[in-house]
């Protein structure tokens, strides 16, 4: 590259952080810029010499020199460039060498680099101005002319960049050596035109454009997600379609009709049971059988406590017939009739239970009255009657009370007389 590092003087590796630097100074500036607090103050009051040998002795002076040569964190990092960039560097070196020598090298046609004819007198004669003086004079004159003219790009000075020349060939690197007036150096151009695509402003603009596009995409995606969520929230949930199993064998039309009838019957029964919960009986259901049940079995189903003291009393159970529905009633009245019939059956069952509970008491009081009358009559005629008559009365009483019969509960024969049976019923009730 034939460029030296502006900090330590070592051969430069590229254009880093706004200046030509070597790899060591580039890395040092990148590390030190973010960790300035770790760098201690200079012990030599900032008078250290930074060169290739002792550049690592004082970090404070080295960082100060990096700032002095124009390095900054916002500067572009171009790194190693191609051949055309090296040509620019060679041109700059040539100009620097010519300015340092103070004379212009003559060309083949007797014309100097600045465009003025070379004199036959020696190069160092006092009558012939040097190349540096002539270039400075012409450059100052051209700047005055440029200030008098209206700038073609008035917005560039506001951004901190030098204004362009009126000549469009000034922006080209090789035309600066062809005219009679030393045009503006290509290194005085704005950085975004000198190296397009690598400048910090161009990178920032590209990053902002990419960020804007990303935000727009995320906004659209969020809108679509919100619309889907609101639609699922406020719309009824769609039930999954019921897949009916298809039989491998082909069914006949008669089988299909039978299956539809069975399905309709089951669906009607299930809907009736779901829509009419009042039809459920609150009382335990009585088993229906062809033979009449005994009173003891009835009481066992109703109250298990009274089974232990129930005697041989047997009563006939009044059969409960379900309400009949006429064939002329429509299907809409079926639910109404079902609920009413269930209410009536509930009331009837309650009245039957009350009747069953009252019947033993009533019979007990009747038998007590008969026993009292019989005992009074037997006491008045006890002297006149024989023991055979007494046994006959006892037999009649036993038959009335039904004590001679035995009732089976769970395989055991329980025989009680009328008095013990009635006493047990009275206590349990």
From Swiss-Prot:
Gene this chain is encoded by: kni
Protein source organism: Drosophila melanogaster (Fruit fly)
Coiled coil start-end: none
Protein name: Zygotic gap protein knirps
GO biological process, one term: regulation of mitotic nuclear division
Assigned keywords, A-Z: Developmental protein, DNA-binding, Metal-binding, Nucleus, Receptor, Repressor, Transcription, Transcription regulation, Zinc, Zinc-finger
Sequence ranges of Polar residues compositional bias: 225-237, 338-349
Job description of the protein: Transcriptional repressor. Binds to multiple sites in the eve stripe 3 enhancer element. Plays an essential role in the segmentation process both by refining the expression patterns of gap genes and by establishing pair-rules stripes of gene expression.
GO molecular function, one term: nuclear receptor activity
Low complexity compositional bias, start-end: 112-126, 375-393
GO cellular component: chromatin; nucleus
Annotated zinc fingers (NR C4-type), start-end: 5-25, 42-66
DNA-binding region: 2-78
Region (Disordered): 112-148, 223-250, 338-357, 375-397
UniProt record similarity statement: Belongs to the nuclear hormone receptor family. NR0 subfamily.
Localization: Nucleus
